[in-house]
Amino acid sequence: MSSELEALRQETEQLKNQIREARKAAADTTLNQAAVNVEQVGRIQMRTRRTLRGHLAKIYAMHWASDSRNLVSASQDGKLIVWDGYTTNKVHAIPLRSSWVMTCAYAPSGSYVACGGLDNICSIYSLKTREGNVRVSRELPGHTGYLSCCRFLDDNQIVTSSGDMSCALWDIETGQQTTAFTGHTGDVMSLSLSPDMRTFVSGACDASAKLWDIRDGMCKQTFSGHESDINAITYFPNGYAFATGSDDATCRLFDIRADQEIGMYSHDNIICGITSVAFSKSGRLLLGGYDDFNCNVWDVLRQERAGVLAGHDNRVSCLGVTEDGMAVATGSWDSFLRIWN
């Protein structure tokens, strides 16, 4: 048995090397070569326009509504808060059954928010009830590990990622898991839906990113390169690439059609992990939230740092860019959210 395993291991290594060679042969240029004549973006200087105060403990997650005005945040204080980003008013403050929340999401329709964490359950809350109060409309149990990330496809479907090494697609009305996405060999930490909603990418503690077909439940591509856990992942606006942030202190850009890593964003002075990543609307800038309390802004094409958003007094745990591209929100363990532009 062990000799068979050894032979299979060697065969896999050989196949991996063949794939590496094939990828190298296909890589006829580099991002640096392609971007050599691109204008520099100049120093990106953003100011904090709003500070959202109200959480009493570390903020773990945030997500903008599709109206680019409201946002939802989740904190260790056991509250989910829906904010009006223009006025800084709290639209809803939702007490959670479990305060160990790690992720939250806003439905595209604006009618629902979802959250989950160490309770292994994705809870869906209806914001548009007749009585005007917010209530749990559905709980989705089924994962055997913590819920690390969730994103709505529509009001009746949500995709989740979990510490049980899997992702899942749920039918919210029936409360059933319709598809399980298995293949990662470490906790899945983050997911991002493609702009056309047909695929999603996931990043995990096996240091790999995977691309999944939502309809047939299959892993279509696997991307390696990181040297440690991938904490965050986000699609490029056109859907042909995605970026990741890792504990190895780098963000990386992967091209889906080229099937490989094409860019890396790092600096000798940055030695801490990345918690969150987001692209500007055009895709020219990549924002990363770091354990050292900063948010770095990278020029995607030239692979150089273009700015820093400094202002939090603790780890930046989450960030998001509005759909209209006009503002960035950062959330932190200092219990505050800041809106920049």
Curated annotation (Swiss-Prot):
WD repeat residues: 54-93, 96-135, 142-180, 183-222, 225-264, 269-308, 311-341
Localization (cell): Cytoplasm
Record keywords: Calmodulin-binding, Cytoplasm, Repeat, Transducer, WD repeat
A GO term from the CC aspect: cytoplasm
GO molecular function: calmodulin binding
InterPro entries (alphabetical): G-protein_beta_WD-40_rep, Gprotein_B, Guanine_nucleotide-bd_bsu, WD40/YVTN_repeat-like_dom_sf, WD40_repeat_CS, WD40_repeat_dom_sf, WD40_rpt
Role summary: Guanine nucleotide-binding proteins (G proteins) are involved as a modulator or transducer in various transmembrane signaling systems. The beta and gamma chains are required for the GTPase activity, for replacement of GDP by GTP, and for G protein-effector interaction.
Subunit and interaction comment: G proteins are composed of 3 units, alpha, beta and gamma. The G protein beta1-gamma2 dimer interacts with calmodulin.
Protein name: Guanine nucleotide-binding protein subunit beta
Record organism: Pinctada fucata
